[in-house]
Structure formats: C-alpha cells, structure tokens
C-alpha cells in the first residue's frame, strides 16, 4: 500500500488506466484535499499557534493540525505520481520521504486522537487529578513523545522504499531483498503477453540490460546460460505443449518482481530434475528453458526438486519476485502491514471507542453544563471521521496479503487501492471545517473572526463533576476544565 501507504509492468500502457473511474476519483480526492486542506490547516495553525492563548486543548489540536498540514504538503507529489501512471521523477530521497510523511501523518494523528480521548476521559472521571496535574507542559511533553513514536514507526518505510527502472522510467516501490512491490501495479499490462525482455524491472545501478556471455558451472550439473542480446518475446505456453518430463513454466507476478537481465537458461540435466541419477541422460536445449519472466517448477512426473540443485548464482534467479517458491509474501511486508493495522488502527480505535462510551455513560447520569460537551463533541466527530477515512486503507492492506493478485478479487483490490490511499489522505483536510462547524451555531460562526471560531471550538470552560457535594468550596475544588 503507504503509502501513501501503501506498492506490472507494461511498455505501451494501452489501457490508459488514468481514464478509469478509480484513478479519476483518486485524483479528484487528492486535488480537493490539497486545495482545501493546505489553506485550512495553515490558517488553523497560524491562529491557534500565534493568536490564541495556549491551553491543553489548543496544544492537542495544534499538533493534530501540524500533522495534517505535513500530509497536505506531500499531496502534489502523490497526485503527480498517480497522473504519471506510477512513474517517479523526483529521485530516490523523495521516494523515501513522501510515503514516510503520509505514514507519519497516520500514526501522529491516531496517537494524538487517542491522547485527546484519554484526556477527555480523565477530565470526566478524575476531575481533581486533572485540576492539579493537567497543564500545558504535560500536554506538550506527551505530544513530543507521540511525534518520536510516529517517526520510529516511519523508519521501515524510509528504509525499504527504493527506485526501480522499467521501460526507461523510474518507479518508486518497496524492495525487500530480491523482492519488490511497485506502487500502482495496475498501471502495467500482462507480464507474459507481448513482453520484451528489454522491459524488465531493474533497480538502477545494480545490474545491466546487457551482459557479456557467461555460464554457470557446477560439479553436479552443467548449466549453460547464454545471454540474450536481442529482445525476445515469449507467449504463455500451454501445459500440453511441453514435453513429458520437462520443467513446466509457471507465470510469475511481474508487477511485484525485480528481475535479472534477460537470460535464457538451457539446463543439461536429467529430465524432471531427479536427485538420484543427476549425472546421466542430459537433455537437449529444447527440453526446458527459463526466461526472467517465468518461474521454474519440476513436472508432476519428477522426484523432489530442491533449490540447492541449482548452480550457484542461478539460485538468485529462482527466488526473484515478491513471492518465494512457496508463494509467501515477504516477511517485512507482512510485519509492516500488521503493525500499521494493530498499532496504528485497531488498538487506538478500541481505546477511543471505550473512552467516549464511558464519557457518554457518565454524562447521561450526571449534571453537566451544556458548554461541557463543546470540545467533547468536536473530539468525537474528529475521531469518527478519522476512522471512516482510514478503515478502507487498512482493510485493503490486509486483503492484499491474503489475495492472489491474478484473481478477480486481487485485480479489484489493485484498482481501488488508489481510492483508499486518497481517502486516507483526505482526512487531513476535514478537521479545520469540523472545528468551525461544531462549536456553536453555524450562522453565528459565519459572522465571527477565525480566532473566535477556534476559541469556541477549543474552549477550556469550567464544568461541575457529577458527584460534587453541594458545599460551594468543595464544588469549586472539584471543578475542572474541559
């Protein structure tokens, strides 16, 4: 996903995917998010940071606005990335930085919203403690810790994002050793139809398009690997067209692979790759072949085939791709996705829902002033909007780990992945408008200054605890800010 957040390859892009509804919808969402979110968050940051008195609530929402503003600043790069059909013209550093900013926004926002929820809960259930300990300094310290944790959660994105070159264009994606995952994989065509061996995804600087003729030799099996100097086109072979006992060719997910140069391998090994009598019955060159598009498996008639039977150096060819010979998703990709789901969504969501449920229950039982629900209402709606925007992103991320991209469901997930990323980014433009609409009556707010609107939304007003005695002195001590 990343990344913004999410993440096969076609030479001509005949399908013109940027004309498809999901891509158009994504571009519209990203454009509106940038046009509305940048001035909106910038205005809130300027007024709340420079014009308003610093309170605990102001600190919370000030840092939340800063996270949203950083996300909005990265949106032009994401929009251009989508408009260029997955091409990345901004270089390696921004390939790492831009997705990291989007993930940073996600973690910082959800951690800040969780802190706001816990703060609301403490105000209601522990008013005396809040009266003595809840202050601006503590809020700033908590926000600082939140930013540190959010930066730590971005490290995997910054480490694993790399530039790949395909069709003479740079593309940005994840690289896990010999495995890779490009952004916007549905921009690329069928990897086995009308594909030239020149158009192979390669990390720049790591391998050349043309190599000198060479061969791999082992003591057990003589493997001759002539280098292909001219573009070759391979069509998907049928199972019946292959000789009995020959190695069958299975399509590999090119959109998620990093490939070596275009080599045609002519193994002189026993038919079916048997282990016992591997020094007899050499095959001719037509019995089996392997291109860098394809993955090699022994036929049903063969005995067990081990990767160690391959000559040294060719084993790297065998394991290229996002999936290994057991069709397993790379462990780092699984770890990144699950961590985002649990730490960046499920756990904070449970905490926020529990906090606001307890608050609603207590408010229904107690005597709370109408003004007390002001910031509470703003916080609840902000949390709800966050969950709506980010839920599809995490669902699609998990499904992408469990679904074969070549199935109809997998292709649908790839097509709508852009929309999920755009919707998650759109969360960064909603909050300024929520602040303006939820404090007081909208008609009154329309006549107020921006500073007055924000002061109403982030107000720190005294309210009375539900269990305060009638004694005025004790009642005043039990009052706290909301």
Curated annotation (Swiss-Prot):
Widely expressed in several differentiated hematopoietic cell lines, in the lung, spleen, ovary, placenta, small intestine, throughout the brain, heart, and endothelial cells. Mostly expressed in lymphoid tissues. Keywords: Cell membrane, Chemotaxis, Disulfide bond, G-protein coupled receptor, Glycoprotein, Membrane, Phosphoprotein, Receptor, Sulfation, Transducer, Transmembrane, Transmembrane helix. It comes from Homo sapiens. Pfam families: 7tm_1. It is found in: Cell membrane. It is a multi-pass membrane protein. PANTHER family: C3A ANAPHYLATOXIN CHEMOTACTIC RECEPTOR, CHEMOTACTIC RECEPTOR. Glycans are attached at residues 9, 194, 266. Interacts with VGF-derived peptide TLQP-21. Among the sulfation sites Tyr-174 is essential for binding of C3a anaphylatoxin. This is C3a anaphylatoxin chemotactic receptor. Its main location: membrane. Residues 1-23, 81-96, 161-340, 401-417 are extracellular.
């Amino acid at each position: 996903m990343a990344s913004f957040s999410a993440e096969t390859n076609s030479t001509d892009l005949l399908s013109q995917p940027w004309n498809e509804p999901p891509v158009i919808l994504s571009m519209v969402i990203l454009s509106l998010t940038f046009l509305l979110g940048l001035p909106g968050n910038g205005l809130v940051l300027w007024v709340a940071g420079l014009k308003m008195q610093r309170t605990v609530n102001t600190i919370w929402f000030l840092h939340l606005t800063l996270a949203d503003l950083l996300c909005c600043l990265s949106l032009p790069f994401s929009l251009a990335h989508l408009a260029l059909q997955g091409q990345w013209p901004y270089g390696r550093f921004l390939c790492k930085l831009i997705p990291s900013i989007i993930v940073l926004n996600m973690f910082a926002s959800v951690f800040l919203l969780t802190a706001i929820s816990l703060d609301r809960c403490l105000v209601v259930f522990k008013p005396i403690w809040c009266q003595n300990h809840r202050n601006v300094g503590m809020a700033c310290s908590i926000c600082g810790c939140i930013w540190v944790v959010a930066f730590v959660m971005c490290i995997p994105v910054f480490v694993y994002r790399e530039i790949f070159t395909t069709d003479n264009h740079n593309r940005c994606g994840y690289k896990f050793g010999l495995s890779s995952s490009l952004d916007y994989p549905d921009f690329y065509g069928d990897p086995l139809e009308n594909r030239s061996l020149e158009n192979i995804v390669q990390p720049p600087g790591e391998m050349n398009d043309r190599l000198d003729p060479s061969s791999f030799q082992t003591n057990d099996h003589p493997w001759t690997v002539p280098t292909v100097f001219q573009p070759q086109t391979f069509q998907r072979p049928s199972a019946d067209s292959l000789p009995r006992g020959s190695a069958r060719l299975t399509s590999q997910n090119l959109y998620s692979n990093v490939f070596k140069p275009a080599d045609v391998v002519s193994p002189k090994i026993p038919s079916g790759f048997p282990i016992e009598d591997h020094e007899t019955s050499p095959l001719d060159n037509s019995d089996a072949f392997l291109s860098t598009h394809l993955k090699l498996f022994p036929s049903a008639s063969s005995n067990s085939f081990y990767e160690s039977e391959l000559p040294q150096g060719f084993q790297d060819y065998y394991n290229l791709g996002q999936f290994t010979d057991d069709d397993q998703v790379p462990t780092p990709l699984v770890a990144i996705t699950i961590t985002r789901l649990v730490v960046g969504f499920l756990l904070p969501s449970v905490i926020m829902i529990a906090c606001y449920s307890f608050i609603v229950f207590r408010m229904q039982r107690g005597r709370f002033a109408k003004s007390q629900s002001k910031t509470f209402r703003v916080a609840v709606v902000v949390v709800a909007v966050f969950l709506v925007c980010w839920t599809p992103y995490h669902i699609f991320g998990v499904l992408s780990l469990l679904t074969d991209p070549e199935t109809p469901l997998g292709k649908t997930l790839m097509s709508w992945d852009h929309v999920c990323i755009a919707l998650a980014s759109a969360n960064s433009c909603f909050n300024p408008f929520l602040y303006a609409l939820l404090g007081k009556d909208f008609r009154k707010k329309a006549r107020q200054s921006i500073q007055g609107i924000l002061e109403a939304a982030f107000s720190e007003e005294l309210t009375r605890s539900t269990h305060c005695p009638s004694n005025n002195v004790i009642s005043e001590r039990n009052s706290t800010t909301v």
